[in-house]
């Protein structure tokens, strides 16, 4: 599990979900061959899978911290940069999206209406103007996947959930939560943790 994925996993656990990382779903697709029909199976990886009795979350996680950030055209697939578009295939390729949702439901025993597709972003491109974030969120709201639209979560959403989880007094041996507690104890956090004595 990558570092930012660890933060997202804590946020998902805070929703009462059991979280697993790096799950591949096989998808059969017709190749582009013109001389004959050829079907190939490829595994499409979902970064994090969160599950509880009534819901299954398939999460694509892109930190993009230390880089330009997540670009709207790459997520939506409206780019000539094939490599960048492929990083978001699960989101921007309707047939693959549909087949992954179907396979996840079959594998784990969920109806499509119980499955949610999410995008977690550490840094959106152009954060000052917020243009890319707005475009991505607007695009995602129009995509019906499983039980609803693709949901988009930014760094603030993730950190808010993680800080809330870290505020509880019960100790959990989790690197992310302990890091937050250490930084607070050292006076390095600019905002104090919420007071949750429970």
Where are these regions (language model features)?
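Intrinsically disordered, low-complexity Ser/Thr/Pro/Gly-rich regulatory segments
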Residues: 1-198
């Amino acid at each position: 599990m990558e570092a930012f994925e660890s933060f997202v996993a804590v946020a998902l656990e805070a929703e009462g979900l059991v979280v697993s990382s790096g799950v591949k779903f096989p998808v059969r697709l017709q190749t582009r061959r013109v001389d004959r029909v050829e079907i190939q199976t490829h595994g499409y990886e979902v970064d994090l899978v969160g599950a509880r009795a009534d819901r299954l979350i398939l999460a694509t996680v892109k930190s993009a911290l230390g880089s330009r950030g997540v670009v709207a055209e790459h997520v939506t697939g409206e780019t000539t940069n094939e490599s960048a578009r492929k990083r978001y295939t699960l989101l921007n390729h309707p047939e693959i999206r549909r087949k992954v949702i179907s396979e996840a439901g079959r594998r784990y025993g969920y109806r499509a209406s119980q499955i949610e597709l999410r995008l977690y972003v550490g840094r959106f491109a152009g954060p000052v103007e917020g243009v890319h974030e707005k475009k991505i969120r607007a695009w995602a709201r129009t995509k019906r996947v499983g039980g609803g639209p693709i949901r988009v979560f930014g760094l603030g959403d993730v950190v808010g959930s993680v800080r809330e989880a870290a505020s509880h007094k019960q100790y959990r041996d989790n690197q992310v939560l302990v890091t937050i507690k250490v930084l607070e104890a050292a006076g390095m956090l600019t905002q104090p943790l919420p007071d949750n004595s429970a």
